[in-house]
Amino acid sequence: MKQISNYDAAIIGAGASGLAAALTVKKYKPGASVLVLEKKERAAKKLAATGNGRCNLSNEACENKDVVFGFFSENGIMLRKDESGRFYPCSEDAGQLASLLTEETVSAGVRIRLDSEVKKVEACPEGGFLLLVEEKGAERTVYAKKLLIAAGGK
């Protein structure tokens, strides 16, 4: 019988949304075991290329821009608005932001597994989810009480 890894929460996708979700879980439930599964070889890979490498995070028309500012500020990332109303990190370096967000997530106690593609998700009758994960050619099973899919696009 295969060994099953158990987590309070699993997040599929280590992009900006997945990492932000993981940080938020740890903020409100510091003792929770959180796993982020990413099929690519690097977390926040697309984030590192956004906004021509400057990382356009939001804009003035965003309904909840205070929430966006608050999240980034709490995680040590200061934003600025350009003349067109777009928000960027003060560093204007998307790669630096991707690295910082990944480091903050790991520092918070979140486990990030790269090269880990989720092949199947099954809801358990008693609650929670079983995930079949292919990781570097081997299959493993993960059980999570809660599941968030933040897989993004192709």
Question: Would you name each region that the model predicts?
Answer:
Residues 6, 39-63:
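Conserved N-terminal glycine-rich FAD pyrophosphate-binding loop of Rossmann-like flavoproteins
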